């Protein structure tokens, strides 16, 4: 089984804590993109990324500092900050669970393409959906092609917990029968009907990834047993390849670390 999540806009230069870091599989492509981003002035970044002038200046500084110097890198999974990662709570996992996550969990990224949890990275800002100036980078989907998908094992189940914007670098290139894309809904207290709540779903994706890791779930049948932060499997709403989990009362309160960015 391979578990896919995606990167976050908010990042930090996380401490290494003595963890040995690995080299991202597509680092050469990341260097190419970063070198190009460094040529764009703050005003252009503001336009392309829809940023305020102040944030564009900050982003320009972050990009200018980006490099591949080994002792400047941080573990990818500790570098991203956001709802998915607050649900994942990687820092609370045992050493054995972290090793398992490093084997089974992959992070889809606009700059790096795909990352293992303990690949070494530097902070950056580049969402997969951005359309950069210049014909080669207008579409990052064209830039990456099938390179990201080729980093995923050719057989076995793929649990897709990534946003569509990111999973598009993988899903068109693999057999649809391999994909399981869970959906997370919260019951609306007013209508009594399940609905999609963005922040809840993001935290649930992280919690689901954590659960898969700690329980060592490796078959589609076991996925239905997920029962964390208030969610339960809904057999009626589910369909092949898309199990649906519904919570009456969201149990992930206090986990979100959404930031202004």
Residue ranges of predicted features:
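Internal, well-folded beta-alpha domain core
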Residues: 90-255, 261
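Near-N-terminal "mature-domain entry" segment
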Residues: 1-126
